[in-house]
């Protein structure tokens, strides 16, 4: 039978030794290359939105880096969960891609102020859940515009910089900053 597994470092190899709890059967016709990418992006995102972010139907989800691998997964999983999805990316072309896979709204953070645009799109409320695989200089303005009791999911640092957030914002917003490390979660809680 064709199977795939999350194997951590070396997990994209053609052969690997992994815990049986991390192995899953592949549907017929599902290519191994696709399976390797699928497991990493969609499992990370499902864990982030369901387990860590507790995204609920009717809530607003802001996805940063929305045209990337985990970003596109977040748009699709967010829609399946019943969220209103706002996709933030660095170009209009990437925004069009995000709309084509289900995003309700888009923000081009290269040409507009993401904080102002998010407030505009949410009637001043902000996003209930922020999915952030980007980090860098977007983190603080986005966190400043998060909804009351919002959940800010730290998924990665694609921009390179690890942001420093003023923790008084978490207090003032009643918000949570939640780390997402699916690989470690899968290892510890298979």
What do these predicted ranges mean?
Residues 1-28, 32, 39:
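Glycine-rich phosphate/adenylate-binding loop and adjacent beta-alpha elements
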Residues 2, 60, 84, 150-151, ...:
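Short glycine-centered segments of the SAM/dcSAM-binding site in methyltransferase folds
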Residues 4, 62, 107, 130-131:
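N-terminal Rossmann-like NAD(P) cofactor-binding module of classical short-chain dehydrogenase/reductase
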Residues 28-33, 54-60, 124-125:
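Short helix-loop-beta connector
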Residues 36-112:
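Mid-domain Rossmann-like dinucleotide-binding core that forms the NAD(H)/NADP(H) cofactor-binding site
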Residues 66, 134, 157:
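NAD(P)H cofactor-binding loop motif with strongest signal on the N-terminal glycine-rich segment
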Residues 113-124:
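Short amphipathic alpha-helix with an adjacent loop that forms part of the alpha/beta core around
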Residues 137-190:
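Glycine-rich phosphate-binding loop and adjacent beta-alpha segment
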């Amino acid at each position: 039978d064709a199977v795939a597994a999350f194997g951590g470092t070396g997990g994209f190899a053609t052969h690997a030794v992994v815990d049986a709890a991390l192995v899953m059967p592949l549907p017929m016709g599902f290519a191994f290359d696709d399976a390797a990418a699928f497991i990493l992006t969609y499992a990370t995102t499902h864990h982030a939105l369901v387990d860590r972010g507790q995204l609920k139907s009717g809530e607003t989800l802001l996805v940063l880096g929305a045209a990337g691998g985990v970003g596109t997964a977040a748009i699709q999983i967010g829609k399946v969960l019943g969220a209103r999805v706002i996709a933030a990316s660095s170009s209009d072309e990437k925004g069009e891609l995000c709309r084509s896979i289900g995003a309700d709204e888009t923000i081009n953070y290269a040409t507009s102020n993401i904080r102002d645009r998010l407030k505009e799109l949410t009637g001043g409320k902000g996003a209930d859940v922020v999915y952030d695989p980007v980090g860098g200089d977007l983190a603080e303005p986005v966190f400043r515009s998060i909804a009351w009791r919002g959940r800010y999911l730290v998924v990665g640092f694609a921009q390179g910089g690890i942001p420093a957030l003023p923790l008084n914002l978490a207090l003032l917003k009643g918000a949570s900053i939640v780390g997402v490390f699916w690989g470690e979660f899968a290892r510890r809680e298979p």
